[in-house]
Amino acid sequence: MGFLSPIYVIFFFFGVKVHCQYETYQWDEDYDQEPDDDYQTGFPFRQNVDYGVPFHQYTLGCVSECFCPTNFPSSMYCDNRKLKTIPNIPMHIQQLYLQFNEIEAVTANSFINATHLKEINLSHNKIKSQKIDYGVFAKLPNLLQLHLEHNNLEEFPFPLPKSLERLLLGYNEISKLQTNAMDGLVNLTMLDLCYNYLHDSLLKDKIFAKMEKLMQLNLCSNRLESMPPGLPSSLMYLSLENNSISSIPEKYFDKLPKLHTLRMSHNKLQDIPYNIFNLPNIVELSVGHNKLKQAFYIPRNLEHLYLQNNEIEKMNLTVMCPSIDPLHYHHLTYIRVDQNKLKEPISSYIFFCFPHIHTIYYGEQRSTNGQTIQLKTQVFRRFPDDDDESEDHDDPDNAHESPEQEGAEGHFDLHYYENQE
């Protein structure tokens, strides 16, 4: 016992010392401090970076011809550098920008290691269809968006990966289309084929029918003479401007219940069924610059109607609005009817049928002798709705906006359709 007593004494004093250290430590002071912004964690986290691949691989993989920003290390910018060939693409790159160059070919080795690519922009180059190696894009299983507009393509590129969601082929020379070229594009939501040489015979096999997710289809400025057949019911936006379409088959739009915007200006439309546009969800309808001679039924949800530059002599309100339902008002707010042959303004009863309307733009009308006239119209003041925001009425910058500015805005911000002319 005498031998163990000093050991117990030593342990006792050691325990007291440790207890006193923790007793005097101010825990509250440590946790009450503000976080240190300069504190660096072991892993250098950065916002807007996909960490599927270690960060150090990103910073070491950019080629000398291009620029890879540190804040977007998965993107490689090679645009506007007078490149004639596609440089080597590192494996980790997901967004590749090669627009505004002088590239003429896309070879099989162009993206051989870049299997993570999600977006490729090859617009504004000199690429021809025969210079695209077969299957070069189909080997990219993660590709979502492909830009090939403003090139020299004569044929629709084929094959393409099933993953593709957005395909832009506008401003080319496409006049050939394989029958099964679009069969595998089951995930495509947007297809732009404007400003090509497409004609009716290329579309007769209902090539768009299997695109069950397609929401936007741009076929403007082609050589179409009839409405494209077999459009998918998922379609929300359809652009057919600047073609030679003269008629619309009855019940054509019955299978397009989701259609939100329809643009058919600069065609040859003449006689159309009066209720052809009776679509449940349509908001914008543009049929200006045609040969229409009379108005048609206005669907309840339509907000913007463009009828300029036709041959309409009278806006028949009975046809436009055959009945008034106080519980379900029409949503029309803007009508453009300039450059027609109207001899008198629309009846003031239009405000009973379309209580939300704030602008009827008459502009100049064409007379029978070829001269232009201005219609004398009464001034109507629309009282603000209860749900109108007060700042819209108090803002002097918005108070004097012209009818053209107020009505020309589209619901899809594409460079083709910024203004209704």
UniProtKB/Swiss-Prot annotation:
Modified residues (Sulfotyrosine): 22, 25, 31, 39, 51, 58, 77, 416-417
Signal peptide residue numbers: 1-20
Disulfide bonds: 321-353
Alphabetical keyword list: Cell adhesion, Disulfide bond, Extracellular matrix, Glycoprotein, Leucine-rich repeat, Proteoglycan, Repeat, Secreted, Signal, Sulfation
TM regions (residue ranges): none
Family according to the record: Belongs to the small leucine-rich proteoglycan (SLRP) family. SLRP class II subfamily.
Protein name: Osteomodulin
Name of the gene: OMD
